Amino acid sequence: MVEHVPFKLKSEFEPQGDQPQAIQKIVDGVNERKRHQTLLGATGTGKTFTMSNVIKEVGKPTLIIAHNKTLAGQLYSEFKEFFPENRVEYFVSYYDYYQPEAYVPSTDTFIEKDASINDEIDQLRHSATSSLFERDDVIIIASVSCIYGLGNPEEYKNLVVSVRVGMEMERSELLRKLVDVQYSRNDIDFQRGTFRVRGDVVEIFPASREEMCIRVEFFGDEIDRIREVNYLTGEVIREREHFTIFPASHFVTREEKMKVAIERIEKELEERLKELRDENKLLEAQRLEQRTNYDLEMMREMGFCSGIENYSVHLTLRPLGSTPYTLLDYFGDDWLVMIDESHVTLPQIRGMYNGDRARKQVLIDHGFRLPSALDNRPLKFEEFEEKTKQLVYVSATPGPYELEHTDEMVEQIIRPTGLLDPKIDVRPTENQIDDLLSEIQDRVDKDERVLVTTLTKKMSEDLTTYMKEAGIKVNYLHSEIKTLERIEIIRDLRMGTYDAIVGINLLREGIDIPEVSLVVILDADKEGFLRSDRSLIQTIGRAARNDKGEVIMYADKITDSMQYAIDETQRRREIQIAHNKEHGITPKTINKKIHDVISATVESDETNQQQQTELPKKMTKKERQKTIENIEKEMKKAAKDLDFEKATELRDMLFELKAEG
């Protein structure tokens, strides 16, 4: 039975500006069973806070889809803060590294599947699916990996092992049930998905938990006591009357179903081998027979094999070609989907199926997989549409799909800080570089920063060199720069190490810098992906965090995309100015803390940064050890909170300290 728990939003802020009307409109739309709604939220208007308020008012389990792991991690941290008493879960691909199996016919090269699974993310995925069967106050932040195949939710739910104090059950029966749901006995290396036995006591480490295991104590053939225990220290956390243990794998199957599945795989193998031999593809037939029989033997003996997901259509006893089960099937009948940055996320969802199919087809043609492997796939876009009943798209620049399916946009244009969309100035390209240099110099004199966006890598490099020769402190941001370096460059821009950053695509997350008062768009009239109306609006938004924000477009003609972006920005500005005038608000630049690589032991302003870099050299051995321990604690906490950027920064600091020790 799913427990009903209301959503409790914790925040020191109340909805402001046009947040209250946006929240009310979306809540009304959900209650009226509207299928599609779009929240058009300008940069910096607090879209996440609006989404949180909608979830609280509507009270439905909610899936929030982001277009990459970094964004999903940021959203997860924010929603955890907003809903500390509710189940906020994280569901992304559990691969730190993933090389899918592939075959290159031209060189006769088979690339074996190679993957590194992140155990913590696997635990979070199990936590997400089990939460959906236990409570209804669930928010799952997911990447596009939520449309990839998962086991049958009914089977997953029906195979739970339920233990209750006073229940008649022999110890051996519990052990058998645990093995049936993919738990393995390990009395020495006790970890997630295992159990250990000590006399009449069975300790089980659920796949969905991080540090807590369940201790079940027997008296004869009866369960005498159930306790939650810290698996490392043995400290008793609390007594339980009842506990539900969910399977250790999402691809779990009953023994009788496994027998039927194996028969189905054997039948398909027989048909496919005949087909290949008739076409005189003897090498492919031999390869397929050998690989499949090995997998079947593993399934008979272990109930599992490497790459078992490729047989998912048989394991779930579905017809060939049918829609796979995904995370979406684990939700009940009444739930909500929110798609963040929908103008990027929806095309990503749409494109997943074709890319996956092309790779698998080559494997099937050359005898590495059975044709049914095609059914272990992401959803087609039409299937995604069928499975989702109510959607809210969230974007500053909604795409064609959202515009086509939404009758009326819910606008959120007013920022709580009173900040306006920037002024836009279009200038001719003649003498643009000299004009640009004088504008940058003007900002440098006022201790402000500049972003310059170009169209090509070569132009970015040449411009950076030219600006350096002109005495401007500048750096070049491009796709080859690693995440950590990227964070450092942005931090250095904020701290004044650089006056300007030159780049090609400055739309990516993490470029919201309050110190930036000028955004320069070169070749604004060259139509294309980087100069489309949506890209221009997103780029213009980078100057909307500063009360002196301005955008200069260098162009010899005004394109349709430019005109749309200029008109839309002006429309928003007028609404924002009117609101500020009515409420007596003075726009104020956001004061955003600068997160530093060395923020663990000393506050990260410039003075402290200098102190910190000198600190390791002055420390005694004891002080250094203490500092290392503090940083290690903070690093583990950051990783646990999914603040991976901070964790990486702290890790590098540790290396530095240890090297100097």
Curated annotation (Swiss-Prot):
Record's subunit section: Forms a heterotetramer with UvrA during the search for lesions. Interacts with UvrC in an incision complex.
Protein name: UvrABC system protein B
Keyword ATP-binding: yes
The family this protein is said to belong to: Belongs to the UvrB family.
Signal sequence bounds: none
GO molecular function: ATP binding; ATP hydrolysis activity; DNA binding; excinuclease ABC activity
Disulphide bonds in the chain: none
Residues annotated to bind ATP: 41-48
Lineage: Bacteria, Bacillati, Bacillota, Bacilli, Bacillales
This protein's encoding gene: uvrB
Annotated PROSITE patterns: HELICASE_ATP_BIND_1 (PS51192), HELICASE_CTER (PS51194), UVR (PS50151)
CDD domains: DEXHc_UvrB, SF2_C_UvrB
Domain Helicase C-terminal: 432-598
Domain Helicase ATP-binding: residue ranges: 28-414
InterPro entries: Helicase/UvrB_N, Helicase_ATP-bd, Helicase_C-like, P-loop_NTPase, UVR_dom, UVR_dom_sf, UvrB, UvrB_inter
